[in-house]
Amino acid sequence: MTTTENVSTERKANPVKSFLTGGFGGICNVLSGHPLDTIKVRLQTMPRPAPGEQPLYRGTFDCAAKTIKNEGVRGLYKGMSAPLTGVAPIFAMCFAGYALGKRLQQRGEDAKLTYPQIFVAGSFSGLFSTLIMAPGERIKVLLQTQQGQGGERKYNGMIDCAGKLYKEGGLRSVFKGSCATMLRDLPANGLYFLVYEALQDVAKSKSETGQISTASTIFAGGVAGMAYWILGMPADVLKSRLQSAPEGTYKHGIRSVFKDLIVKDGPLALYRGVTPIMLRAFPANAACFFGIELANKFFNIVAPNF
């Protein structure tokens, strides 16, 4: 099966179409990858063990086993309502931002961008998604960790969590971690789209028909997702710790988190949770681009000139 149109098309980018197809792809991403995201967050935010004590989780599979034992399989899906509710607009804004970033740099209708320009367009997309991403991530992290750390259940779902955050600290509390989210997404989004487009170019050059197969699109999306996390993981660890910490823990924001983590845990702590996120990255992002592929095919049938 071949794709008649995908994200890497050389035709003048269409932000509106990218908004719609990206939203559907984002839903596919969350549904396929949330359990491993929960494990990642719990590993990143687990309390430091006292001298002589064992850590709360010994690794990815231990975290999964304890979560299922203590909370059932549903425990792996804690906090999914926040990203699932916000993921359509988040991915929609991300892919629309990418299309707009490309469009602003394209000099002609069929002009092909250079790889540095693709990186810039991808980074530009991070500006669009952060406004929605940051509060959604803040709520998701709190819901994912409130049981994992053995404390009393403070939040009864997404709406309750958002309401309590606003009551306690206003919009500043709801948007806590926005700078850390942007620090992660601007460079990581740039690499994400750069890797995707480069792999699509390779697939197209090897295709006898000049068309790109669905399998190639899925593979490129999966690898791009892994590249995103290789670059974005350190900022994501800092973001998760900042967003899950009680108010006043880190007085200088992400700088305080970075200093505390490096001094007490060492630089390798910046990649804590890398195993579940890498296990998640390929299938989740492959599912995302497969969803985009299906959405594009739908539009090609019902609105071929869109």
Swiss-Prot record:
Phenotype when the gene is knocked out: Flies display defects in the unfolding and expansion of the wings resulting in a loss of venation and a marked decrease in their size. Lethality is polyphasic with flies dying during early larval development and displaying apparently collapsed tracheal trees.
Solcar-type repeats, residues: 13-104, 113-202, 212-298
Keyword Membrane: yes
InterPro entries hit by this protein: Mitochondrial_Carrier, Mitochondrial_sb/sol_carrier, Mt_carrier_dom_sf
Cellular component GO terms, alphabetical: membrane; mitochondrial envelope; mitochondrial inner membrane
Cysteine disulfide partners in this protein: none
One GO-annotated biological process of the protein: carnitine transmembrane transport
Residues spanning the membrane: 19-39, 80-100, 113-133, 177-196, 218-238, 286-306
GO molecular function, one term: O-acyl-L-carnitine transmembrane transporter activity
Keywords assigned by UniProt, alphabetized: Developmental protein, Membrane, Mitochondrion, Mitochondrion inner membrane, Repeat, Transmembrane, Transmembrane helix, Transport
Coiled-coil zones: none
Domain of life where this protein originates: Eukaryota
Places the protein is found: Mitochondrion inner membrane
Primary localization: mitochondrion
Topology of the protein relative to the lipid bilayer: Multi-pass membrane protein
Function: Putative mitochondrial carrier of unknown solute specificity. Required for gas-filling of the tracheal system at hatching time of the embryo and for normal epithelial morphogenesis of the wings.
Family membership: Belongs to the mitochondrial carrier (TC 2.A.29) family.
Name of the molecule in the record: Congested-like trachea protein
Lineage, opening ranks: Eukaryota, Metazoa, Ecdysozoa, Arthropoda, Hexapoda
